[in-house]
């Protein structure tokens, strides 16, 4: 899911056609509307859950755990902290399955209430993925569960990060708009020195329909061997000779896998008419050359974009806190 908290959404920008404050049901509906997300998760559940003991961590309305029951899981534990969703999970399981008498399922508030026996669960499921790949503290908590069940199948078991260069018409429109703006923002810190024209900080975006991009691997976050240290330095290098001349924006995106099966992504290669409930993040830096880092707190989801000036010094282009209110 994206980083929703306390049943409302901040004012960073329109989520889709429906703006304003969101209830927890709106958040769940937004995930259900992401067809590609559902297809990937369902494919993995069909492949791995039959006859298995399953935990669905961050269960929401119970969508994934119920689908596991429908596909032959013998036992499912739903872990969802929002107790107002528990009746929905119960009813969803009731109306969607004529389950065998041997099938068992449980609904609980947190992971302390699930069986603590090592390797009790054979499949660990969580849509513990946010806009930046990491979903607040949820991904970290899922990592704790997977450590207790090292022989389990994890859906997903890793997040792979990429950067790609693209041409975004909106960037050029913004530059022209700011140059024509009646108040001079262009020369804030000297001639043509401004953070606004173009905006050179990391920012949220929702790019789709870029089918011919080159995906450049940044790093992999292993969800079965989750980092115990809070910060991970995901470094990558840009070389302007490898970026097409007309490209004006770097988009950062990710893919999630279970073994060799890709199940989730927020790639700009998605069809332009598809609905993607995740944002991407990206930036524009004049010259597109140098060493960068997604300096990430993998316990909280806080991500900074750094640009390294040399080996001993670094410059923060912008640090973004991806948490909501």
Where are the model-predicted features located?
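Class I SAM-binding transferase module
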Residues: 2-57, 62-325
């Amino acid at each position: 899911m994206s980083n929703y908290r306390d049943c409302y959404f901040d004012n960073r920008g329109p989520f889709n056609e429906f703006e304003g404050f969101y209830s927890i049901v709106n958040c769940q509906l937004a995930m259900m509307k992401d067809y590609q997300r559902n297809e990937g998760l369902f494919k993995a559940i069909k492949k791995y859950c039959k006859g298995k003991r399953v935990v669905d961590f961050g269960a929401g309305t119970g969508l994934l755990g119920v689908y596991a029951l429908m596909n032959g899981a013998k036992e499912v534990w739903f872990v969802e902290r929002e107790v107002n969703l528990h009746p929905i999970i119960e009813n969803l399981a009731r109306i969607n399955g004529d389950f065998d008498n041997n099938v068992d399922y449980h609904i609980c508030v947190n992971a302390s209430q699930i069986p603590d026996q090592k390797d009790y669960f054979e499949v660990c499921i969580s849509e513990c993925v946010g806009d930046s790949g990491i979903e607040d503290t949820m991904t970290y908590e899922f990592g704790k569960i997977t450590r207790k069940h090292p022989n389990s199948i994890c859906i997903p078991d890793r997040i792979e990060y990429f950067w790609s260069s693209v041409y975004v018409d909106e960037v050029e429109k913004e530059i022209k708009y700011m140059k024509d703006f009646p108040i001079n923002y262009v020369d804030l810190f000297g001639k043509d020195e401004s953070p606004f024209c173009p905006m050179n900080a990391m920012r949220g975006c929702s790019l789709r329909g870029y089918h011919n991009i080159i995906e450049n691997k940044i790093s992999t976050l292993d969800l079965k061997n989750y980092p115990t240290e809070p910060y991970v330095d995901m470094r990558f290098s840009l070389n302007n000779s490898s970026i097409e001349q007309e490209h004006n924006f770097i988009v950062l995106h990710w893919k999630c896998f279970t073994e060799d099966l890709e199940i989730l992504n927020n790639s700009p290669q998605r069809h332009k008419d598809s609905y993607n409930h995740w944002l991407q993040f990206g930036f524009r830096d004049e010259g597109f050359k140098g060493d960068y880092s997604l300096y990430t707190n993998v316990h909280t989801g806080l991500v900074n974009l750094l640009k390294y000036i040399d080996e001993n010094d670094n410059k923060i282009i912008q640090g973004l806190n991806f948490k909501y209110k």
